[in-house]
């Protein structure tokens, strides 16, 4: 089917335009119509993306469904997917209908709320399918705007502060990437991402001030420029401080999208740009990345143990889990990269579900303070069961997708650096500590607080939202080859080219 990627990318945008231009009036009927238009658009987008998945050839590691048209000023509108990017497209289209359904109770500026999420979906998909530097940057940066509005308009009491902190961190982190893109165009004469993957950027060591030499030279500088953007987006320690504030102030649906998809743009960027385009720079900075990741895993896990706000605890948990992802990516072997991608997919399901779990009781009690709860199992048995399932999955219980991602990632890291891997393994114990501590305080114990004695269990709508997330977490936990077979050839191609480039450069250096 021609133009399938364009259809998937811009279908939510078309629905947003319909809501903005056609939808008139206000009141309950207009709000209900806006919700149904948004839900229908996201469901249709997911169904169309299934056609993409059905027609995808996993054995082909190259780009598929490529669309390439001349655009402006010599630039090209070019889209395509490989085994890595198609997974993130599917994650996005799978989660968005659930996100819209979780926002069914919203009553303030409903039409605008739905438009913001539809625009955000289109921009997120665009990031994963763009094959032109400028197009990628436009999608990558434009995605800040709807998320900024979602936090700033529909967020909590400190929403303005959190929205601006989110915007400034992520925007300023991308400034260096823009400068690097201009430099890449001047050196390579193209903005085509596939072409740039095979371009040999200068890598000779650069002397500074006569006493210090930058290994990898220009490649390392380009790597660091992209690293600044992707590290903030993931986020990595110590540029993670915007995330807890953003999660705490964002509405539930905003937290789901932020944790499940937006953070993955950083990991995707490392896979699409950092490793294939700047192998010498990546190799030079690998130890640095390992150290930051290991510190993130342990430090943010310890910080999570001290939290009294449920959303903030889960936010710090996300930073710790992304530490495993960056370790796996920069291990640069099949198991490590497979595990990192699997971990990102799994984290999308599990973290999204955990934020939904917080949203369920927040809608009833209007507080996220852990101390305000206790004994919920006595009034909300279905909620207690679902919350326990995703708590165990977040810890990495065998049989869930959380276990597979962590196991593969650690397996890959052990092959590269045993000490770092052992240090990172301690994070598994810490994650069990904070996750079970949260669950015990919220769900177990006596139901002594009067305000909780009339709380109702989950509705049918809420259970229906969780059902697909439970199914995917279990399915990928017992049958992980559904993912590894899809991404395997593309990951193998990435890893082989990375090491081949390093080997070729090493031989050239030795010859000189």
From Swiss-Prot:
Q: In which family does this protein belong, per the annotation?
A: Belongs to the complex I subunit 4 family.
Annotated Gene Ontology cellular component terms: plasma membrane
Which class of enzymes does this protein belong to?
translocase
What is known about what this protein does?
Answer: NDH-1 shuttles electrons from NADH, via FMN and iron-sulfur (Fe-S) centers, to quinones in the respiratory chain. The immediate electron acceptor for the enzyme in this species is believed to be ubiquinone. Couples the redox reaction to proton translocation (for every two electrons transferred, four hydrogen ions are translocated across the cytoplasmic membrane), and thus conserves the redox energy in a proton gradient.
A GO biological process of this protein is:
ATP synthesis coupled electron transport
**Where exactly are the transmembrane stretches of this chain?**
3-23, 36-56, 84-104, 112-132, 133-153, 166-186, 208-228, 251-271, 285-305, 313-333, 341-361, 384-404, 419-439, 464-484
Q: Which EC number(s) does the record attach to this protein?
A: 7.1.1.-
What is this protein called in UniProt?
Answer: NADH-quinone oxidoreductase subunit M
Give the membrane topology.
Multi-pass membrane protein
Keyword tags: Cell membrane, Membrane, NAD, Quinone, Translocase, Transmembrane, Transmembrane helix, Ubiquinone
The major lineage groups are: Bacteria, Pseudomonadati, Pseudomonadota, Alphaproteobacteria, Rhodobacterales
Q: Where in the cell is it found?
A: Cell membrane
Reaction catalysis annotation: a quinone + NADH + 5 H(+)(in) = a quinol + NAD(+) + 4 H(+)(out)
Task: Return the Pfam families for the record.
Answer: Proton_antipo_M (PF00361)
MF term (GO), any: ubiquinone binding
Q: What is its main location?
A: membrane
